[in-house]
C-alpha cells in the first residue's frame, strides 16, 4: 500500500464516522467521552510505560531538555488530560446552536447555526496529550479526526490512539507511518479531509500550507 492509499484509507473511514456522528445525540457523545476518560485511567500503567520509552529514547538521542519536558506525561499532566476529557463532556453541545436569526423584508427567516466541518486533520508536535485533547474536542463538536503526531512521541501517541479508537471508533484515526509524505497527503486529500489544523512550530505550519489543497487553520507566530 502506498502512502497515498494508506492516508486515503484513514480519511475514508473518518468520513464515514463523521456521517455517523451527525446522527448521535449529545448524550451519546458525552457518554463516549466519559468512557474514554475512564479507559485512560484504567490503562495508565501501559500508557506511562509507552511514554517512559519515548522519554528515554529522546534523552539518548540528545534532544533538548525543553523538548523532553514537553514530551513527558507527568502524573499532573496525565490527570489534567483525563480531567480535560470530562470537562469537554460537560460542555454544552455546540452542534446546531443558533448563532443569529434574521428576518428578511420578504418574511423569510434566515438562521446561522454551528455545524461540524466533517473530517479534521490535526498535525501536532511533541506533546502526546494533544492527541487526547483533540480527539475529545472533535467528537464533542461532531467531527471525525485524523491525527498525526511527532516522531519523538511515537510510542505514546500510538498507545493513546489505541485507547481512543477502542472507545470512539473510526471517529479517531491515527497516522502511524513516519515521514513528511503522509502529512503532505493529508493536506492534499480534497473531498476526504475538510480542514487541516497544524499545532506546532512555524516550520511545520509553513510546510503544511505549501503542500495544502484544502483549507488550513493556521498561525505563524502564535496566538
PLM feature segments, named:
Residues 90, 94-165, 213-218, 223:
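Conserved small-residue-rich beta-alpha loop and adjacent elements
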Residues 1-109, 137:
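N-terminal Rossmann-like NAD(P)+-binding subdomain of aldehyde/semialdehyde dehydrogenases
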Residues 166-175:
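A glycine-rich helix N-cap at a beta->alpha junction
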Residues 119, 175-223:
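Conserved NAD(P)+-binding/catalytic subdomain of aldehyde/semialdehyde dehydrogenases
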Residues 141-146, 169-170, 186-193:
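Short, surface-exposed connector motifs at secondary-structure boundaries
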Residues 46, 129, 155, 181, ...:
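Short alpha-helical
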